[in-house]
Every structure is written in structure tokens, then in C-alpha cells.
From Swiss-Prot:
Record field: compositional bias (Low complexity): 98-155, 340-351, 687-732
Residue intervals of the Rap-GAP domain: 950-1162
Gene3D superfamilies attached to this UniProt entry: Pleckstrin-homology domain (PH domain)/Phosphotyrosine-binding domain (PTB), Rap/Ran-GAP
Membrane in keyword set: no
SMART domains reported in the protein's UniProt record: PH
Descriptive protein name: PH and Rap-GAP domain-containing protein DDB_G0271806
GO biological process: cell motility; cell-cell adhesion; chemotaxis to cAMP; Rap protein signal transduction; regulation of Rap protein signal transduction; regulation of small GTPase mediated signal transduction; response to differentiation-inducing factor 1; sorocarp development
A GO molecular function held by the record: phosphatidylinositol-3,4-bisphosphate binding
Biased composition (Polar residues): 648-676
Keyword line: GTPase activation, Repeat
Amino acid sequence: MHTGEYSELLIGINGHMKKITLKLKNNLEEDQYSNCVKYGWIEKRCGKNQSFSSWKRMWFILKDSKLTYYIKEKNLKKRSSTIGSTQEFFKQQHGIDNNNCTNSNSNNNNNNSDLIHLSAPSLSSSTSSTISPISSSSSLTTTTTTTTTTTNANTNNGLSDSINHVYLEGELGKKKEGKGWKVRWMKLLEHSLVYYKSSKDKEPLGIVNLNECQDCEVNKESSNKFVVVHSSNRYYFKTNTKQELTQWVKSVKSRIPSINQTKMDLDQFQLKGVIEFNSIQQIAETFKFNSQPNCLTITTDEKAYYLSFDSNKDKLDWLNQLNLTINKFKGGFNSGGGSNNSSPSSLQSQQAKESGNGGSLSPNILGNFKSSIKPWRFSSSPSQGRVSIGGGGDRSSTQVKFVDNPLSKSSNKEEFDGGEYGSQILPRKSTIIGPNGGVKVSTSGAVELSPVLISSNNNNNNTISSSGNSIPTCLSDLINESSDNEDGDDLKMMIPESLKNEMMRRSAISSLKNFKLEIFIWSNHQEVFTFLFSDSVLVDQVKAFAFKKIPSLANLSVLDYRLGIDEDTLLEVEFLKFIYSHTMVELALKTCGIVKIGIFHHRKDRRVKEKLYSDKFYGHLLSQSPDGRKGNGVGIGGNGIPIEYSRSEPNLQSCLSSSPSTRETMVPSSPSSHQLITPPPSLKQYEQQLSSSSSSSSQQLQLQLQQQEQEQLLQEQPEAEQSQPEPQPQLEPESEIEIEELEQPIEELLNISTTPISIRSNSILSSSTSASSSPSSTPSLTPVIERQQKMSAAGWHSVNPSVTLNQRRQLISGCPGWNIEVSNPTSTFTSQGFKPKFDKQEHGFYRRYNFDGTSTVQSFLGVDMKMGPLAFSLAKDANDNYRGVLHTKHGAKTISEDSKNIVGILNLLSLSKKVKTKKVVSHLIGLLDPSIDAKLLNLASNQSELQKELLSFEERQTTSGFKFGMVYCRHGQVTDDEIFSNKQGSPEWDEFLSLIGDKIELVGWPHYSAGLDVKFNSTGTHSLYTDYHGNEVMFHVSTMLPFSTTDYQQIERKRQVGNDICVVIFNDGTLSYMPNTITSQFNHVIILVQYDKQNNGYKVSMACKDGVKSPFEPLSPNNLIKKSDIKDFILTKLINGELASLQAPVFASKITRTRESLLNYYISQFL
């Protein structure tokens, strides 16, 4: 059985045994408060090893021989704040029966003098006459009043009618932690604090159970705020005056049991732990936790307990009581040679002198206890240990001899130095490969792990050692860790020594397990390497060894690559053991003992580019290893990482012998998208295979290839062209030509199915073959061969099959998540008579009819169940027409209606002005949206302020400033790093910029800046700007943004362009562009522009992300766009593209939430 299985077994056994022991101990004690000296709420630091710990509030009971602490039962359901549960809570807390409620006017009149109403108006005017101060908490609990109100026959249905104990009520500001301030009507009851929306409401919004509260205190001395600390939250309240604040704090405090030290009902608690007095070695004051200034440390034989108190007074009270109780239990305590009758204060001063740090006094040391009574131990061999006195790293320490418990971790005896968790971040230490396969993790406080456990004959206690050094074993550490429960209690379960020894022996044998790992590198010439690793190896060790031993990875950066099951599932957490790094890895190792892992770049966009442009990124992987190693080999098993490895390469003979159905090919799924699988071997491999064969067979094979190419070409040409010889164009040596897509006859001859690809080759056939060809092969030289020779003369080079070569004539190549706009073959674009149409809402309602005109605007607010918050404004213009605008979370709608038509339809002549306005509003809203009920709208208050808010709200939705990206791409650039590294563009690029806008200087620029720095030139000195039909447009030009000589990724340039919704790519080459080249969540529209030198015009194509409604005006034409027309086309396309993108789900949801929150704010303020 594996070591991990033993540890899980031990953890389960210890956990169950501990729970059973504590429950038995709790049940056997019929009265938990018997022999009780002191009890109260104390915060205890909990967590394994107390390194990643939290503070939990527990109920402590100090008895004459031990200190026990309890915690609330976890299976108790928390009370909800709903109305149903609120009623049940009132029935439980106050014994109320709704069916037996009685209404007594006499009780209300007689007891009205004892009821305290803290309403804001009454307090400000006559506070002294309405407030009757409460002298003490006892008077509040004993002098309760019965107050009921006269209600109708439906009294039994109202919850507020069931409240018969109200001690304090008034209007307060209320705020939950993490929420905003709200005005609520508060009522203080016997055991709860109830809050309503207003004083007239009968159903409460929620209840704060004071029995579950821990404290009530003034938040800040200079403010009128106080906080009620609940077990699950914090409630902040705000009063109008200091007198109200004092009254509320005093009254609430008197009803919190934890403050008044009322005995808690332990039926709702479970025993969490016990601290026996005979195991306590010292009690000290500690100041290592910044957030807990009043702390004590109780150090026992096995661990240290950290307790935090609410105040220094509580801490001193508990210290004195602990000292007296332990002194009484042990008949006097040791204080380092002091007298047993020393008081705590004298003992404190005496030990402060002995334990001063650098001559300074340490008044925190209060006692050091030692008893001859020791609990039962597993081992009889003594050991030395050091116990920290004072609980801090700067305290002096004294050695105390005690018998060690093998089930307790040594790290528990000394608390980590460095203060409270979260105050500092411990740096990750390097992992060192140890001898015999051992992995020593050099982390502070960690135990050295050894996957190969060797039994030592020199140790009688069957401990485990590695390389002669006695260190704790993996299993024993896991056993020790299993003994530390959530709060690290000192109750350890008893495991027989024989069972422990047997587990140690078996784990030493089973720890020699290993697993087989296949590492593949994605490329056209895919290689797979097989290694045998120990099961204790980490993910980063596997990756580092792969980069060290695989020759093709020698020149790559280890930090830029990750191991992964596939390109979408990477092993990002590299400090884990490899066998536990992912669920699929664990499953594969459990089922077959082998797993296949690839090496991928950590950036997703780079992985996509490596797939599509494998010839560029993986060209260096085609080289063979320096030592020519093939097949299986022996790794570096001596240092414990891999044991053996093997390497497999593609074999031509296996490709020839396999059937077409078994070979993986590249199959296109659609004209714009391709499903990429393992490609076939390249032509270079076939050339090497052909050259190694006999000369006669090589000549025969080449003749067959030439004949088959000629036949294929003749089949594709029309019959008219077959009768006439094809004209041969005159080519310049340095010119580039585009060739038609040709089939690869060599693949057909080898019975391998591929897609048509474009080939550029310096030498299609090997030189040795062409030189030794027979004379009979000379007349069979076809136009295909001649065309290949011309390509070689023109400088075309051989590349691996690539998807982009199939789409050379397309400006934009397809990729997942993007849609390419299909150009209209019959449409043309010209700027003559062109009037741009923008798909944006041009309202200007409030600016036109209220602030810039003389019309009277009335605004109405309301909430619809389906549409949410609504705002409708009505105005009557100079032409006696009614105009209205309806704002919802989905946008704004406007309407205009002639008043004569409305009067005739609604018969408004005999109606009053108020009724007439309601009918007009109802009529207009029915025309805008019939599903909205106009009766839900009410006339808002403070119309002038609301009109200003609605004007601002309208201007937010009306976009007048646009920012777009403008990027220059040279010929052959395929990655974003290359594109953003262009310091300057070509003359065609500069001409294109001058056609689109004006080059402006940023310093002191007074108009729309699009986030560019106009004061200090931190984002460049110049930019491109234009004002197009009232729309200010600023471009983020890639060559004008700051260039960094040290940052090869040009993060500043990517940040500016990556935040633009629409981007223009000026492609100064012939390669097609992929829309996902620049990785950004904001880029939704890509417009590619390519200059045609021969026709002196621009080719334009557009692609947009999924979710963007397309097409939008103007449509991309099939022909060229003239230079004089390019500005109108590009700017109109960009503006409409951004407006369409804002309707995409990723933007629309955010805009909808913003509108809804603003409308809700207007309703809360003006309705």
C-alpha cells in the first residue's frame, strides 16, 4: 500500500477517534459548569501548524484542573432573514402565539411613559422630555413594558403586532459590512434588534439576533457611529447626536449575553478541546499579532495556544485567574527559581529582568510551569526540545526536557517567526535534487522528503534515514500532520507501535514506484520522447529535464513554456507533484501507468500562431539531435529524476506501408476554417528517401511524378487552353509571383491524401537526381517543371504545408470566433453624394427642450416588474407638439405627437391639467411600449435637480468621441511582437495616414485625447486626429506610440491598441492577416487595408467577433476604393462598427447594469 493511502487512513482514524473522545467526554460531564472558576468568550488562533491560521471566537470554561473550550455546532441551521423565518424567530424568542394576540388600549396608554422613542425629529427638538435614561442593565431586563397597538381585524397577520417587548426604537442609519448606508427604523427587543424600512411598516426587513452577537462598541470616538459585531457579519449604525449614540450602545450592550458573561447553553455547543494543567509549561504575553494586541500564549508539552481578548482588562483578569487556579492545582508554580508565593505582578517584574532582550525589560512573561506528571507517550526515548518563552521571535528561550510524542510535529513546538499571517509573503525557495531520488524542499519549517525510504539498522525505533542523515520520514510526517486537526488540538489518538512499524516497513517498499511519461512536441516533424520518472518528481523538474535532454528545445526559454495535456489544458501549478498535477494525469496513471504530455507556449495566442505558422516557429525542430541518439536509452537515473527515455521519429517506410485511412492528414472543414491534425511528412524527407534508393528506381519514380503532374494540370485547364501553348511570362530575378494551387503528385503516388497547397521551392527535385536523369526524361519536361524552375529563379523558398498559403488571395484568413464580411460583387463605393448614417441614438432631449429652450419638462419615475426602473420625460415644444423620451435599462426611446391629434383622441378639453398630463403620458408610453403600465409612473420631486441628472445620463449614452487603433504590418510579419516593433512605416503608410486624419501634437491638445497624455508626452509626442461630421476621432497609431528598446513585446503599444474596440491594420505585404493576431478582449472589429500599387487604390476587408451584429454600413466593395474615398469609407465603417460592438453581449451587459443602477439611484433620490 502506498504511503499516501496510509496517511489518509490515519487521518480518518484520528479524526473519528477525536470526535468520539470529545463527545464522550462532553456527555459524561452532566454539568459542564461544575467546578467552574471562570467562563467567557475568547478568540483562539486555529489552523494546521498555525501557519495559515484564523481567529475563531470560542466559549472557554476555566475549571480547577483544566481549561476547556467549545464551539457552535456546525450542523445547526442559521436563521434566515426572510419573513417566514422572522415570524418563527419571534415565536421562539418571545413565546408569541399569533392566534392568541390581544389588543389592549389601556396597556398602551398606561405603559406609554416607559417606552423610549428615539425618532430624529423629537430628539432634535425636545430630547430631554422624551428620553428616560436607563440606569443599569438590570433595570432594563427587569423593568420590561408591554406595548401593543390598536389594529384592525387582521392583526394576527401582522408581525409587528406580535411584538410585546420594545425597549428602544428610532430612526438610524444602517450599514452592513461591504454595503451602503440606508435609513431604517430600528426596534430593540429583549433578544433581538429589528429593523424596518419605515416606522409605518409592520413587516421587518431583518433581525439581528443579539444572542449570536459578540460586542457592541463605538466605531470612532469622533463620530456618531457604533458597530454591532455579529458572529457572521458586522452591522454599523449611525445616530444624529452623541446622546442617542450613548443610549443605543448602552441598551444594546446590556442585551448581548457574551458581554454580560451570561452562561451559554452548551446544548448548542460542542467540545472542541481541553488544555490539561499538568501539561502546561508556561503562560506568556505575546505581541506578535498586529491585529490582536491583547494576546496570551499557553505553551504545553506539544504545542502553543494563542488566545486573544477583547481588552487588556479581560486579559489581566484571565491571567490572574489562571495563575491562581494552576497554583492551587500544582500546589505552587515554578518561576525560574522564584518563590511559590510570588504574586503575578512580582513574578512579572522578576522575569522581565531575566529575559530582557538587549538589556530591555520584557513585562510580558508571566509564568513557567513544569510538572512531573506526564501523559502517556509512544516512545520511551527522551529527546531535547526548545520552547519559546513569550511566543515571539525576539524573546529569549530556555530548554525544557520532555518526552517527545512521535505523532506531534516538531514544527508545532516552535511557532513560526514573522508575525501574523498576511503581514508578509514568504518567498518560494528552490527545489534541490537530493541523493537517491530524494527531493529536499528548502522551505523554512518544512520537512525533507525522500521518495526512496531506506530502513536504517542503527535505529532501534525503526526510524527512516537517507544517506546516513537521520531525518523525519514522509510517512511519519504525514502521521504527525494527520494528528493536527483544524485547530491543532493537543488530543492525540493512540496508534499501536506494532501497527506503526508495519506501516513504515511497507511504505519503504512501495515508495519505489515510478511511472512512464511520453513528451511530445507539436510540429510538422513531430517527435515523441519517453521517460521513466519517480513518482515524487515535481512538474517543474519534469519540464526542466525535458528541456535539458531534448535537443530541439535547447534554444528555447524554459520560462515561456508549460507542460500540458493539450493546448487548452496546461499544468500551470508547477510546484506540485506531477502525479497529482491534474485529474486526467491521475486517471491515466492509475489505469495504464503511462501519460502523454505536450510542451506548449504559455500564451494562447502564441500557441495558435505556432500551429498555423509551424514553418516559422518549428523550423529549428527539424534538425536531428547532435549525438544522433535514436530508440531507447538510459537517462540519469542516478540522481533520481528520469530512469530511462526513448525517442520515436516518423518513418517513411511506415508511411508507405500504412493505408490511407490510418494516416492523419490535414482536412479542411470549411473554406475559412481548417481543422489541423498531424500533417504528412515534408517533401524534404521524400527527397532524402529517394536519394538513398538506387538511381534507376529514382529516375523511374521522377518520370512518373512528372507525367502525373502534367496530366493533372491538363485536366484542370479548359479545352481551349489545352490546344494553345501557354504563354511564358518574363520574370525578373527578384520579383515575387503568385502561383495557382497545385496538387502534389508525390503524395498521390505515395497514396497519401492531402489538400491542395501552394509550394515555393528552390529545388523541387534533388540535384543528384536531376543531374543523373536519363535522356528520355528530357522531352517530358512539362510546363509544371518549367514553372517550378521559374519559381526557383524568382527566389521562392520551400516551406511546410500551411493553411495560410491556401488563402493567399484573401486579405483576412478565417479563425475561430471571428466572422469575415462577404463583399458584394456588384457594389462600389464613392464619396460623391455620400451621406454617412450612424447607428447611434441622437437624442439631445433635455439639452434641446429644457436647458437650451423655453419648454417645460416634467419627469416621471417608476418601477416595472419586467422592464425594471423607468424614467419618462414629457415636454411641449414651440410648435405645440408633445415630445417624450423613455429611459429604461435597455436604452432610450423618443416620440413626438401633435397635440391636436392627442386632444381629439383623448377628449382633453374638459379635464384638469393634472389629469390631462396623466392621460398624455399614458398615451405616449402606450405608443412607445404597450407592455409598460403608465400607472406605475409618478411625478418626481425636485424636478430641476432631476433634469440635470437626466441630462448627464443622456450625454453618457450619446457617444461623440471615438478612439480607434491604427497598426502598421510589414510584409512577412505574423506575430504581434513583430508588428508592434515597427518604429516607422513605408511611404504608403504615411500617405494613408494623411488621407485619414491630421497629425497633431499632443502637448496642450484641447480636444478629445482618447486617453493619451497631453501634458508630459508619456504616450508619444504626436497622434492622428479628425472631426468627422461632429464626431471627434483620435487614433492610437502604432508607429507614433512610444517604442521601448528593452521591451521586445512593446507592452505600452499593445495596451493602447488592445483597449480599442475597432482596429485598422495596414498590411504592407501579401500574406493574409489573422484577426486574432493581437490578443485582446476589447478588439471586436478588424478592418484590413492593403494598398494596390498597380491600380493606385486600396483593398479593404472587415472581420468582427462573434456577437457583433453585421454587416453594418457601408458594405465592403469587391473592387478597389480610391484614395479620395477611403476616408469616408474607413471612418463611417469604424464608427458604425464600434456602435454595433457595444450591442455585443460582453459590452451590452455592462452598459445595461450601469443604466439600471443609475435609474434606481434616481428613483431612490427623487421619488
